[in-house]
Regions:
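Conserved acidic segment of CheY-like receiver
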Residues: 19-31, 35-40, 68
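Short amphipathic alpha-helix used as the core "switch/output" element in two-component signaling
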Residues: 57, 80-92
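Alpha4 helix (beta4-alpha4-beta5 surface) of REC/receiver domains from two-component response regulators
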Residues: 81, 101-132
Length: 353
């Protein structure tokens, strides 16, 4: 049996500081409702109800509600149905879904209605995740791993001065310019995580490979919309990577990594913002939904997209921050001492396109 992962998040902001924002919380379990309300009360105006009917009445009668937090399991209807009806009243209201159940069971409705913030309940860690999610959704300030680990100190490095040991609470940052650099960094980082934190090298290398592959091969395109560093095979539905790649200046991406207590942190930031919330939910759905004819994942033979599913399965937490057409940040957390049974879905998207 796995024990729940301990919280990576420390309190941030000034104690007692009130942030503009009114939140409607829908939770029928009194102890959970009180815990969430008390946790958010110092910064937000929180109105709490226990039923979907009361929630819809509040939304109709209180036009200044800025955000809805709802449990999935409610007396009259589930939280997804409440979210759908809430959007009819308030089309642009941000919605956070919370649950004690396996999010994967609801992947059909998640994809259909574009729910992108689903947090599983697992103690204090989920409370901090809710607080950070609320802050990001209301402020629009979505980028930065320091929102989750405020104690991180950032330091820039290159391959030439790659650290022999990763200092605790230091976020190492480097720019990736070539295919060779990507490979060297992936190997060195994964090996150091194994040596220092006993993290499975196969897992961290898979994560690093996946997040940097998207930044290097799929994000950069030319004026015609074709991939700059991959070529489609004319005989098969596969993409072939160019050899000895040197990225153009505008395509170079940032890789960040480090350790903080029992946590391993990996972040990749590209300057293109081509990944979308719709694509992420679609790919998760493809790999979580069985083909009725084979019983295997529907996306098993897709030419791409499996990496998003693999990342979420391997990591303790996975966060996508997207400013469409400008920037994508993929944040990966891996706990080296404990596991989290059910995984969140966390996709933030600013659409400037």
């Amino acid at each position: 049996m796995t024990k729940p992962a301990s919280a990576p998040f420390l309190d941030f902001g000034e104690a007692g500081k009130k942030t503009t924002g009114k939140i409607l919380l829908v939770e029928d379990v009194e102890s959970i409702q009180l815990a969430i309300r008390d946790f958010l009360f110092a910064r937000y105006d929180v109105q709490s109800v226990t039923t979907a009917e009361h929630a819809l009445m509040s939304l109709a009668m209180t036009p200044d509600i800025d955000l809805l937090i709802t449990d999935i399991k409610l007396p009259e209807m589930n939280g997804f149905e409440l979210g759908r009806l809430a959007r009819k009243l308030r089309p642009n209201i941000p919605i956070i879904i919370i649950t004690s159940y396996d999010v994967n069971e609801f992947i059909d409705i998640i994809k259909e209605h574009g729910f992108s913030q689903i947090i599983t309940k697992h103690g204090r860690m989920s409370l901090k995740e809710i607080e950070i999610t609320v802050e990001k959704m209301l402020s629009g300030d979505i980028f930065g791993v320091q929102k989750y680990f405020p104690q991180l100190r950032e330091t820039e490095i290159t391959l030439a001065d790659f650290p022999r040991t990763f200092a605790n609470a230091v976020l190492y940052t480097t720019r990736v310019r070539t295919l060779h650099e990507r490979g060297e960094l992936t190997d060195r980082i994964a090996a150091q995580f194994k040596s220092q934190k006993k993290a499975p090298e196969s897992t961290t290398k898979l994560v690093l490979d996946e997040i940097t592959s998207n930044a290097m091969f799929r994000a950069p395109v030319n004026d015609g919309g074709e991939f700059k560093y991959q070529t489609k095979n004319s005989h098969h539905d596969i993409l072939q990577t160019h050899q000895n790649i040197v990225l153009d200046e505008e395509d170079r991406f940032t890789l960040q990594f480090g350790v903080c207590d029992e946590w391993i942190i990996m972040v990749c930031i590209d300057p293109h913002g081509r990944l979308t919330k719709k694509e992420i939910l679609y790919r998760l759905h493809r790999h979580l939904t069985p083909d009725p004819n084979t019983g295997l994942p529907a996306g098993l033979h897709d030419s791409h997209g499996r990496g998003i599913f693999l990342l979420r399965e391997q990591l303790s937490s996975l966060v996508f921050n997207i400013d469409r057409g400008r920037k994508t940040e993929v944040i990966c957390f891996y706990n080296t001492t404990s596991a989290q049974a059910y995984k969140n879905i966390s996709v933030y998207e600013i659409d400037n396109v």
